[in-house]
Swiss-Prot record:
Protein name: Tryptophan synthase alpha chain
Cellular component per GO, a single term: cytosol
Pfam families assigned to the protein according to its UniProt record, in alphabetical order: Trp_syntA (PF00290)
Molecular function terms from GO: tryptophan synthase activity
Positions annotated as active site in the UniProt record: 50, 61
Pathway where this protein functions: Amino-acid biosynthesis; L-tryptophan biosynthesis; L-tryptophan from chorismate: step 5/5
Function: The alpha subunit is responsible for the aldol cleavage of indoleglycerol phosphate to indole and glyceraldehyde 3-phosphate.
Keywords: Amino-acid biosynthesis, Aromatic amino acid biosynthesis, Lyase, Tryptophan biosynthesis
Recorded family membership: Belongs to the TrpA family.
Gene3D superfamilies: Aldolase class I
Enzyme class at the top of the EC tree: lyase
Species annotation: Methylorubrum extorquens (strain CM4 / NCIMB 13688)
Length: 280
């Protein structure tokens, strides 16, 4: 199923631009609203969607995504329900890649073979599991690759030349460069250093390199897009959703549009930084 991811990057290259990768939490603030948000993302300009798996101990997530996960859990969202949302999304969209992002515990509890079967059937294209290092590839990474699911690794500012080959060894789909140290949504990246880091990674792999953590505005997205194959935005979208909620964390009449509006701004930023189209 990496074909959808490959096709998305190919389309962006043909247009001479980076891809916009958007993250939202599954089930936030409730499953039905979450599905509407998911459906709105590609229509607003997202090229790839990361769908977060709610978890009780999200160690790499900042306050915004932690709060989103708690709202989703309170609404009864679990891994089975998340796969069901993706199945429903696929009824109307068979083109946009969907990558599940989260932690290993819910997958382990579900059962790896069962999870991979159900993820493939639901139309999942890839996985980002932030707490499974390369040393544990046999747990999930290698079985996922055998099923045709991309297993996407994170590289960070502290990933040195000695560590990078291990990070890239079984990576598929794309490489996700975390532009800051710390948790999500807590700082703005140093754009100059990000470009240097992307160049360092691309010297070791032919995979697209996307950059996330700290991207909040269309201007930020444009800066990153000039030096990367893709721009990931998560906390800013989750924040936009949270600000739209009614008391009691209920979806408001403008909740879906609050997210879609920011995605349109981000998409415009990415497109404003367009490079020469591939082959031009």
């Amino acid at each position: 199923m990496t074909a959808r991811i490959d096709a998305a990057f190919a389309r962006c290259r043909a247009e001479g631009r980076a891809a916009l990768v958007t993250y939202v939490m599954a089930g936030d603030p409730d499953p039905e609203t979450s599905l509407k948000v998911l459906e709105a993302l590609p229509k607003a300009g997202a090229d790839i969607v990361e769908f977060g798996l709610p978890f009780t101990d999200p160690m790499a997530d900042g306050p915004a995504i932690q709060a989103a996960g708690l709202r989703a859990l309170k609404a009864g969202q679990d891994l089975r329900g998340t796969l069901a949302l993706v199945r429903r999304f696929r009824e109307g969209d068979d083109q946009t890649p969907v990558v599940l992002m989260g932690y290993y515990n819910p997958i382990h509890t579900y059962g790896v073979p069962h999870f991979l079967e159900d993820a493939q059937a639901a139309g999942i294209d890839g996985l980002i599991v932030v707490d499974l290092p390369p040393e544990e590839d046999e747990e999930l990474c290698l079985p996922a690759l055998e099923k045709g699911l991309a297993f996407i690794r994170l590289a960070t500012p502290t990933t040195d030349e000695a560590r990078l080959p291990a990070v890239l060894a079984n990576t598929a789909g794309f490489v996700y460069y975390v532009s800051i140290t710390g948790v999500t949504g807590t700082a703005t990246p140093d754009f100059g250093r990000v470009s240097q880091a992307v160049s360092r990674i691309t010297a070791h792999t032919n995979l697209p390199v996307v950059v996330g953590f700290g991207v909040k505005t269309g201007a930020h997205a444009a800066e990153i897009a000039r030096g990367a194959d893709g721009v990931v935005v998560g906390s800013a979208l989750v924040d936009a959703l949270a600000r739209s909620l009614e008391p009691g964390d209920r979806a408001g009449s403008g909740t879906v549009e609050a997210v879609a509006s920011l995605v349109r701004e981000l998409a415009q930023g990415v497109r404003s930084a367009a490079k020469a189209p591939a082959g031009a």
